[in-house]
Amino acid sequence: MTTSRSKSEQKNVDPEEIAKFSALASRWWDPDGEFKPLHKINPVRLGFIENHTDGLFGKKVLDVGCGGGLLSEAMAERGAQVTGVDLAEQSLKVARLHALESGRQIDYQCIAIETLADQQPASFDVVTCLEMLEHVPDPKAIVKACAKALKPGGKIFFSTLNRNVKSWLLGIVAAEHVLGWVPKGTHQHQRFIKPSELLRMTDAAALEDIAINGLIFNPLKGFVLSEKDVDVNYIIALKKPES
């Protein structure tokens, strides 16, 4: 754990975002609470990750922006050696307590990914950074740091929201104001990231894209993957070249 951060790392933290998630920390593991959509989408995200890693058992995994540990615990249940990092200490306290109650061995750290990547470059078989990029001022720096922490030949996953009229209507108007799936103010549409923009960031980090799928809501099936519809939520799998 570190107690100090560089000026560049401090600039890549939005205090309002940290405060927002800290205030909701106690409700991370309530499947019917403010994080209900993440509980619903988590199995789909996990399946996508497992499919593109040939399983997680025995792999060293870094979960960036782990929050209360929903994905971290799910990956640990699959036999992964998980390190979860986040800058919302209240969320990490909840994650640690839940892991203890569940009997899961997960290394949760309150540390910036930029710092961790400097300390442990090329150390992880798999890196995940899901629903986090749209909450930071400089997502490109996060992508670069995640890639730095990944071993050559390792797999890396990002998920976020596309930026267009449809994502504004569904991701903000409907989800926050009409259906109440997530608290009002959870997202800022201007911070949503188009797939083409994310791919430019991953290209700059020397990552090779493998697959991109949309995460869409089906009234009958719940959240499902789509190879064609990336208009709102989407997830991307990439690989770090061997050399």
UniProtKB/Swiss-Prot annotation:
Substrates-to-products reaction catalysed: a 3-demethylubiquinol + S-adenosyl-L-methionine = a ubiquinol + S-adenosyl-L-homocysteine + H(+); a 3-(all-trans-polyprenyl)benzene-1,2-diol + S-adenosyl-L-methionine = a 2-methoxy-6-(all-trans-polyprenyl)phenol + S-adenosyl-L-homocysteine + H(+)
InterPro entries: Methyltransf_11, SAM-dependent_MTases_sf, UbiG_MeTrfase
Entry's EC annotation: 2.1.1.222, 2.1.1.64
Top class in the EC scheme: transferase
Pathway where it operates: Cofactor biosynthesis; ubiquinone biosynthesis
Xref: CDD domains: AdoMet_MTases
Keyword annotations: Methyltransferase, S-adenosyl-L-methionine, Transferase, Ubiquinone biosynthesis
Record-listed S-adenosyl-L-methionine binding positions: R45, G65, D86, L130
GO molecular function: 2-polyprenyl-6-hydroxyphenol methylase activity; 3-demethylubiquinol 3-O-methyltransferase activity; polyprenyldihydroxybenzoate methyltransferase activity
GO process annotations (BP): methylation
Family note: Belongs to the methyltransferase superfamily. UbiG/COQ3 family.
HAMAP family attached to this UniProt entry: UbiG
Described purpose of this protein according to its UniProt entry: O-methyltransferase that catalyzes the 2 O-methylation steps in the ubiquinone biosynthetic pathway.
The protein, known as: Ubiquinone biosynthesis O-methyltransferase
Native source species: Idiomarina loihiensis (strain ATCC BAA-735 / DSM 15497 / L2-TR)
